[in-house]
Amino acid sequence: MMNPVGFRFRPNDEEIVDHYLRPKNLDSDTSHVDEVISTVDICSFEPWDLPSKSMIKSRDGVWYFFSVKEMKYNRGDQQRRRTNSGFWKKTGKTMTVMRKRGNREKIGEKRVLVFKNRDGSKTDWVMHEYHATSLFPNQMMTYTVCKVEFKGEETEISSSSTGSEIEQIHSLIPLVNSSGGSEGSSFHSQELQNSSQSGVFANVQGESQIDDATTPIEEEWKTWLNNDGDEQRNIMFMQDHRSDYTPLKSLTGVFSDDSSDDNDSDLISPKTNSIGTSSTCASFASSNHQIDQTQHSPDSTVQLVSLTQEVSQGPGQVTVIREHKLGEESVKKKRASFVYRMIHRLVKKIHQCYSISRT
């Protein structure tokens, strides 16, 4: 329902109860109120998901909904207030809604609730819940009107909504078991970020280059999946002997990918590989870089190898970097695009350092 500029749907308490809530409960034809206020199960959605369910789109941080009263227990009048992310907590006393004209009788009640996270911390989401009182003993008031308000900034609504969508996507990704019964897990790729010391990457072989223009990412990955080969290789990197070379400073660190976003970090396994090094980025000069790939048939899941690197170096000695296979882990094909993206990012980082060293 599109609204003209300046239009506001702001009924007062009496109008909400008399002109919307009571007809919704008592009239046989409720189309005249349903086209203004949508009916939802409030506790089936998080507060930040409710604005998209509103019949009238508002940027003022106020939305109206009809909701069915759902009791927490079979006996008593305690309503269900809990959602997946938190719960609605009643604050203050129940207020009476009176008819301002005529006999000024009581026509309903209003309760104020605040949404709290699971840990009990308050949020900026507030709800005014309206209940119509029965004028006659046989009247059943099934519906309530929920006036949902957001007291924070508008940008916080969009960020909360995005976070909810991401959580939903992650919940849809199932854990898969391989044919051998081992549980599938994800592959974590890590990178080295240079700090105050400068480093040079040189002689990167053409096999590690990925041409996005010639081969689309999806097609190249499908080709990798459909390869029937069953080969596994451990690649040893040898660095040339330099008798005149002395390491600048001993460095020990963890390879981390600062460029990865929250989506990627949620998808991967919490297992990380730490890499101990005893030289700076400059010690990687004249090294040959190759990417080891583990291939499997399309009928089986893809196997990825987590690698740890042990580096031993001294003046006048040959540096040997061995990559040991820690374990073969199967992953679902739906996660293949994520793994490819992480490897692609690693290769791009190496190319950037290589380009800097050439200038």
Swiss-Prot record:
Residues 107-157 bind DNA. It is found in: Nucleus. Residues 3-151 form the NAC domain. It comes from the Eukaryota. Coiled coil: none annotated. GO terms for molecular function: DNA binding; DNA-binding transcription factor activity. It holds the Pfam family NAM. The NAC domain includes a DNA-binding domain and a dimerization domain. PANTHER family: NAC DOMAIN-CONTAINING PROTEIN 82-RELATED. This is NAC domain-containing protein 4. The gene is NAC004.
